[in-house]
Regions:
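Histidine-rich, glycine-flanked metal-binding segment
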Residues: 2-14, 20, 24-67
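Histidine/acidic-residue-rich catalytic or RNA/ligand-binding cores of hydrolases
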Residues: 81-85, 128, 154, 207, ...
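Active-site mouth loops of central-metabolism enzymes
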Residues: 86-99, 165-183, 235
Length: 426
């Protein structure tokens, strides 16, 4: 097989002729050239003005659109949305489960998502395996386990006494005072967490509470935030759906509100004052079946009645939005469906794209390296045969993502007439 750019071939690739949406929030630019060299963006500008170098590989993308590699700031590779998920865990050997999770990583990358935050359920070894080139997937920030109070969102013990998390390994850190919350944070940091996740409210899938119920107290959340700051300023994400818990989380100093479905005006004020991010995870409202119990489905239905109105108000007032899907609750590899859902809140397609690129990079503290197509940044890039400004929903269908580049390597090549890229570890 001939050398393939991004594997063992030339290290300078020129993508030319495409329309570029660079992720900064600026409008599209036609007939561009994007040069990738040694894993980073070089020249980005008009195709007719680009410098040429002997031996470079030129890929003609006329009629396509280039965008930065996307982020999904809220996934769970632990699980999938198949109704038989629990049954498979019981039947499969643990090694099979590991390979199933690796497949979810690949599906996510092939969909155009090159960076994710996994907010609970897998250990740091998956992150490390991707970074070492042992398996294909997006780069990852991981939370490992959720900090919850006894009987809260991440206490999954059923009335029978059985804890379903025993099937998948530790999923929770239960803490019932500030000292326990601090200790739980230290355990997570010891185990390799990049981000700490706290449960500030109840939730849809938790058996013993409602989304409006409060979770950890302000004092408990503040203890987590303080401890995380002592360790390289680790961010804290808050599962928060009800209005009171959202405000508790913000007063405790969290970096992001996950879901935020019932946020009220005071909560929006707090978000604006503190510069916190909102990750709406709208994709969960568009799911049917899966592993929702009848009780969880009813909670979801009730939340949906108010969530779109409240989240739209947050968008209208300028709260910083980052894209996240809760993939795992929903399907993996369909992450970019969330872009169309964000436009339902009043965002323009360009704003939705920025939520999945630059804004998400800012949330993860990676905006100096990722999130936009700019000279000097890490070369994460996708090409689509759709026009996302006319049909942004097309990006949610992986067949419309015809090329994916991560760290300057082509990891998906669906362009007609080109040999498929060998998808294997470095």
């Amino acid at each position: 097989m001939a050398d393939t750019p991004g594997t063992d071939g030339p290290n300078r690739i020129v993508f030319t002729g495409a329309r570029l949406i660079d992720g900064t929030g600026a409008g599209p630019v036609d007939a561009t050239a994007v040069v990738v060299e040694d894993g980073r963006f070089g020249y980005v500008g008009p195709a007719r003005q680009r410098p040429t170098v002997a031996g470079e590989t030129v890929i003609d993308l006329a009629g396509r659109t280039l965008l930065p590699g996307f982020f999904d700031c809220h996934v769970h590779f632990l699980m999938d949305s198949n109704a038989d998920f629990t049954g498979r865990l019981l039947r499969n050997r643990p090694t099979v489960t590991v390979f199933e999770r690796a497949q979810r990583l690949r599906e996510t990358l092939q969909a155009g998502v090159t960076t994710v935050r996994d907010l609970g359920g897998i250990d740091a070894g998956y992150r490390d395996a991707v970074a070492l080139g042992l398996t294909e997937g997006p780069r990852m920030h991981v939370a490992l386990r959720l900090i919850s109070h006894t009987g809260g969102h991440a206490d999954f013990r059923l009335p029978s006494g059985f804890d379903p998390s025993e099937l998948v390994g530790p999923f929770s850190e239960l803490a019932d005072d500030p000292a326990q919350a601090r200790l739980a944070t230290r355990r997570l940091l010891r185990d390799g967490a990049d981000v700490i996740k706290v449960c500030a409210t109840g939730g849809v899938n938790s058996p013993a509470d409602q989304p409006e119920d409060e979770g950890l107290t302000v004092e408990e959340i503040a203890a987590v935030v303080e401890e995380a700051k002592r360790h390289r300023g680790r961010p804290v994400a808050a599962h928060a759906q009800g209005a009171r818990g959202i405000k508790n989380a913000l007063r405790g100093g969290v970096t992001s509100i996950e879901h935020g479905y019932l946020i009220d005006d005071e909560g929006i004020d707090l978000m604006l004052d503190r510069g916190a991010f909102l990750v709406p995870t709208l994709s969960t409202f568009h799911l049917e079946g899966g592993h929702f119990t009848p009780q969880a489905a009813e909670k979801k239905r009730r939340l949906a009645e108010s969530a779109m109105e409240r989240l739209s108000e947050a968008v209208r007032r300028g709260v910083r939005i980052a894209l996240g899907t809760d993939a795992g609750v929903g399907p993996h590899g369909r992450n970019l469906r969330e872009l169309a859902h964000l436009t339902e809140l009043g965002m323009t397609p360009i704003q939705a794209i920025s939520a999945g690129t630059l804004r998400a990079a800012e949330l993860l503290g990676l905006a100096d390296q990722l999130g936009t197509v700019e000279q000097g940044k890490v070369a994460d890039l996708i090409a689509t045969d759709a026009d996302p400004l006319i049909d942004i929903g097309a990006l949610g269908r992986p067949d419309h993502v015809v090329m994916v580049v991560k760290d300057g390597r082509i990891v998906k090549d669906g362009l007609p007439g080109r040999d498929a890229v060998k998808r294997c570890p470095r």
